[in-house]
Amino acid sequence: MSDVQKSRDTRNIPISKVGVKDISYPIVIMDKNKSIQHTVARINMYVDLPHHFKGTHMSRFIEILNVYREKIALDNMEAMLQRMKEKLGAGSAHVEIEFPYFIEKKAPASGAKSLMEYTCEFSASLSSEFDFILGIKVPVTSLCPCSKELSHYGAHNQRSIMTVRVRYREFVWIEDLIEIVEGCGSSPVYSLLKREDEKFVTEKAYENPKFVEDMVREATQKLLAMEKITWFSVEAENFESIHNHSAYAAIERDKREKGVDNPVDKPGNCG
């Protein structure tokens, strides 16, 4: 049977990434408290394509995914990418995995337990060297310092999303990153709150106002202090409750470069 994908292409144009995208697939993730956690991921898998090949073999991506479905973790991510390169005759391979991750949280006053969902991601690539990035998206509450200062009856507050991505030299637990990020907002977010919890969360946020600039700077300070992390990016987006726009801030640091531990600037003013 003829193999059309292997036929020669005469346009002399290589392709950086080609593959399969948005695969819904069950995976098993390492859990700090329960050893493992079963979840369902959205997965993208790509390789490069040399200029002389007409196409890649899409079915081979799924075959490789089937082999690693119970073993998608940092320990074997490089081996999975190497298998992609070999099976598809590629010079580079890439995989992006996004999945919901659940942590049991206690409400701050009542102690009521509930599961909290966080969006997490793995991004890995292999060409001449292996690269891996762990990412998390954490909802928090933010309360505007400027609104609090100017108002007699309260301050506007809103739900925010903080996104942190890290490269590291030693293993980092998802739970540990989430704990760091949740401490950078005015208050954490909970899936279950009783009346006494709502009072606690509301008052805590009011006593702990944060600009979006404050949030990314506080996260940066904490991540700079973690020796096992070599690179990171931090983003914060406030879904403003009294504006028709979001507030946004971002910081990226490569700790292997000189000067990344310099003191950061003071928070910006309300504008």
UniProtKB/Swiss-Prot annotation:
Keywords, sorted A to Z: Hydrolase
EC number, UniProt record: 3.5.4.16
GO MF terms, alphabetically ordered: GTP cyclohydrolase I activity
Involved pathway(s): Cofactor biosynthesis; 7,8-dihydroneopterin triphosphate biosynthesis; 7,8-dihydroneopterin triphosphate from GTP: step 1/1
Swiss-Prot/TrEMBL GO biological process terms: tetrahydrofolate biosynthetic process
Positions marked as site (May be catalytically important): 144
Residue stretches spanning the membrane: none
Catalytically driven reaction(s): GTP + H2O = 7,8-dihydroneopterin 3'-triphosphate + formate + H(+)
Job description of the protein: Converts GTP to 7,8-dihydroneopterin triphosphate.
UniProt similarity note: Belongs to the GTP cyclohydrolase IV family.
HAMAP family the record matches: GTP_cyclohydrol_B
Name of this protein: GTP cyclohydrolase FolE2
Organism the protein comes from: Geotalea uraniireducens (strain Rf4)
